[in-house]
């Protein structure tokens, strides 16, 4: 059952705001991974490639951390993750 914003407590509204921010951050991390991967394909310098590969791994860690936070704040989303993982 969905609720209108008028029926939500300040705490529920704050959680929704936090979730919106976290989801936007998640999008940013995924876009960064894609961008670094594209750059790797264009780079010729091996040190630069290695550095970007390392950065991609860090970005993937950020994705995992954000997904965990989102699941903690959104039980319905957590349930969806459980169904597909």
Give the ranges of each region predicted by the language model:
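Iron-associated oxidoreductase/ferritin-like identity signal
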Residues: 1-85
